[in-house]
Design a protein with these regions (language model features):
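Terminal peptide-recognition signature
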Residues: 22-25, 64, 151, 159-162, ...
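Small-residue-rich helix-interface/hinge motifs
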Residues: 3-88, 399-421
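Interdomain regulatory linker/hinge segments that flank or connect interaction modules
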Residues: 84-123, 165-208
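Internal alpha-helical transmembrane segments
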Residues: 71, 75-146, 434-438, 443
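PDZ/PDZ-like domain segments forming the peptide/carboxylate-binding groove
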Residues: 127-171, 209-247, 251-255
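Residue-level signature of transmembrane alpha-helical entry/exit and packing/kink sites
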Residues: 3, 7-11, 100-109, 113, ...
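Functional transmembrane alpha-helices
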Residues: 2, 92-100, 212-247, 251-252, ...
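Alpha-helical transmembrane segments of multi-pass membrane proteins
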Residues: 15-19, 74, 116, 392-401, ...
Length: 460
């Protein structure tokens, strides 16, 4: 419960910052061009609000709603998600959105997206200035990588060290590395201490590379018992630090990657068990191991968990701690170009990955607030918090600029149409478009959060 609260608080604080500043972008340009803002709210307030106030001589009511799904800035004379059609029937007023020239209305609509994007670049810059950049380069991962059968068919071997492609060297083992490999025609590696290259098709499906079990490529993790949990199957077996597990159910496990894969297979069998007896049978495994103090091979049968849960109960040695960490420090002025470059790469990667959303697997990967919350660490960490806030700011900026009615991008699309053709879409058309866009957003919200629920119950 404590972990859930920490993640939930981080998500709520992050989204509150982003929503306030996003709506603040609309607010700023509205005030700049003399457009009246009727309401400025954090969180939505259907039926009631937690509190609100209206400063003296101000046209704007500020408030806090109770539904933490965002916020809004109600601008006079604008067809938006408030669906205030009565106002649009009244004569046009000089302080209304609809009375302003198209270029001013355009800036008001892109104000939120602009603020979110600039905010992300600023946060990344300040992170680099305050903490610097720490990472483990792929070429410094001396144990190399672990590859699945599809990768091995292309010529990769376990323990190959990935260096880069024709596009340049990999920085570290991350999503950018996967993106480069998926579109590369050549990958440079180090095998047995010698540099060499492999030819690639250039059109690998990145989503399949990541979704496959095992994945196309993973960091090779040696199987090294670091510590054993009390009263766990591992402790009942008498395992301790330094001992080696050699096989599970007759399947050889040479790495922690192999070990996790075999436990996953046990979990798959357990998931299809229909009776308690079947569950016990699935959880009963033969384990071949060797004590650090002896060269004698041992083989025992044990129950992998006391409950219907696959669990062995030991902590593996974190191999990443053995590798050289590269640290780059940035001065105040140096941090801005570095932060801008970093943020731009994040945006480019996110936009490039959007094509996978329209695939069957991509649709399953959609997530709602539960998925967003899970991205935050289980302990409060300001570095991780600001990194995630900057990332969410980029997502918010990109998603809002999509040409979907009810989003900023939908309004921008119709404004650009007006500026190019000189014809302004009618109010009735805009109202209908807003309803359609709102329906699309509600549907996406339901699907994304339904996916969270299905994942929580292990159905997806």
């Amino acid at each position: 419960m404590e972990v859930f609260l920490i993640k939930a608080l981080q998500l709520m604080l992050s989204l509150s910052i982003l929503v306030l500043l996003h709506e603040g972008g609309h607010f700023f340009f509205s005030k700049l061009f003399g457009v009246r803002v009727e309401k400025f709210y954090l969180f939505f307030d259907p039926w009631f609000h937690l509190f609100e106030f209206k400063p003296k001589n101000s046209d704007t009511t500020y408030g806090l709603g109770w539904l933490p799904l965002g916020g809004y800035c109600k601008i006079s004379g604008m067809i938006d998600e408030s669906f205030d059609t009565e106002q649009m029937k009244q004569p046009e007023q000089p302080y209304e959105f609809r009375s302003k020239p198209a270029w001013q209305r355009l800036l008001i609509m892109v104000g939120g997206v602009l603020v979110n994007f600039v905010l992300a670049l600023f946060i990344y810059s300040m992170i680099l200035f305050h903490w610097g950049d720490d990472y483990v380069s792929t070429k410094d991962m001396t144990q190399g990588m672990k590859f699945n059968t599809e990768a091995k068919a292309l010529g990769f071997q376990d323990h190959d060290i990935l260096v880069g492609t024709e596009k340049g060297e990999f920085k570290t083992f991350d999503g950018d590395m996967y993106r480069d490999i998926s579109t590369a025609s050549r990958v440079d590696i180090i095998r047995n201490g010698k540099p060499m290259s492999l030819n690639l098709p250039g059109d690998l499906d990145m989503l399949s590379m990541i979704k496959e079990s095992p994945r196309f490529v993973e960091v090779y993790i040696p199987l090294q018992i670091d510590s054993v949990m009390k009263d766990s199957p591992a402790s009942k077996l008498g395992l301790a630090k330094g001992d080696k597990i050699l096989a599970i159910n007759g399947k050889k496990v040479e790495s922690f990657n192999d070990f996790q894969l075999e436990l996953g297979r046990v979990g798959d069998v357990l998931a299809s068990a229909s009776t308690h007896q079947d569950s016990v049978k699935a959880l009963t495994a033969s384990v071949e191991y060797m004590k650090a103090s002896s060269d004698t091979l041992k083989n025992n049968v044990l129950l992998l968990a006391d409950k219907e849960n696959v669990k062995f109960g030991f902590y593996n040695h974190p191999v990443m701690l053995d590798y050289k960490v590269t640290h780059i420090s940035y001065g105040f002025f140096q941090s801005f170009p570095a932060g801008i470059k970093y943020g731009w790469n994040v945006l480019a990667g996110y936009v490039g990955d959007m094509k996978y959303v329209f695939s069957k697997e991509g649709a399953k990967s959609l997530g709602g607030f539960g998925a967003l919350g899970s991205l935050f660490p289980s302990m409060w960490d300001w570095h991780a918090f600001w990194m995630m806030t900057a990332f969410l700011s980029i997502i918010l900026a990109f998603m809002n600029i999509l040409p979907i009615p009810a989003l900023d991008g939908g309004h921008v699309f119709f404004l650009l149409y007006e500026m190019i053709t000189g014809r302004k879409p009618g109010d009735k058309f805009m109202e209908r478009a807003e309803y359609v866009g709102f329906g699309i957003l509600v549907l996406l919200l339901v699907v994304a959060n339904l996916n969270d629920v299905l994942r929580f119950f292990g159905i997806m």
